[in-house]
């Protein structure tokens, strides 16, 4: 966190009817959940709710992170389990989900299932590039439901690059 964010979270008691959410990324590869500075900053925000962003597109896992698909799942699940052990409500923000689903349906579905099994209260499906059309979003979510995924624990994080964020959120 930076000083401005820290000051904001220090004032959280002033917001009687709001639920603040600390946002950060999963632990980094090669670090434990207890020794990852970024994850520690999310915890130290003092919120009851945390949203973690993690990769759900195999291309980004292998090229941007330079790790295996299984190693990425371990980053996600261990981070979620750690936060749940601290009593946090956890939202997992599945970055590049819709592009990842189009490229490797099996892996993207496994990310959602593993995050939920690890204890994520919500899995938020991201149209990170903002290029999805409403039909694609609807068909993807229908596929997840057919795979036995609990739709009541799914959210959407639609970007508006093609002016479809509202339509995609309603799809």
Each model region followed by its residue ranges:
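A glycine-rich helix N-cap at a beta->alpha junction
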Residues: 19-24
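Alpha/beta enzyme core
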Residues: 1, 7-15, 28-154, 170-171
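Thiamine diphosphate
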Residues: 159-171
């Amino acid at each position: 966190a930076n000083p401005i964010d820290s000051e904001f979270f220090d004032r959280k008691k002033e917001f009687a009817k709001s639920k603040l959410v600390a946002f950060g990324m999963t632990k980094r590869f090669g670090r434990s959940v207890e020794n990852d500075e970024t994850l520690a900053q999310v915890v130290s925000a003092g919120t009851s709710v945390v949203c973690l962003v993690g990769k759900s597109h195999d291309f980004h896992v292998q090229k941007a992170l330079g790790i295996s698909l299984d190693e990425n799942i371990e980053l996600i699940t261990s981070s979620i389990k750690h936060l749940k052990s601290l009593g946090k409500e956890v939202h997992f923000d599945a970055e590049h989900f819709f592009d990842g689903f189009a490229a490797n349906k099996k892996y993207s579905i496994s990310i959602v299932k593993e995050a939920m099994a690890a204890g994520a209260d919500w899995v938020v499906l991201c149209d990170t590039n903002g290029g999805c059309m409403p039909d694609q979003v609807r068909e993807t979510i229908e596929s997840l439901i057919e795979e036995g995924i609990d739709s009541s624990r799914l959210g959407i994080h639609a970007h508006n690059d093609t002016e479809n964020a509202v339509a995609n959120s309603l799809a």
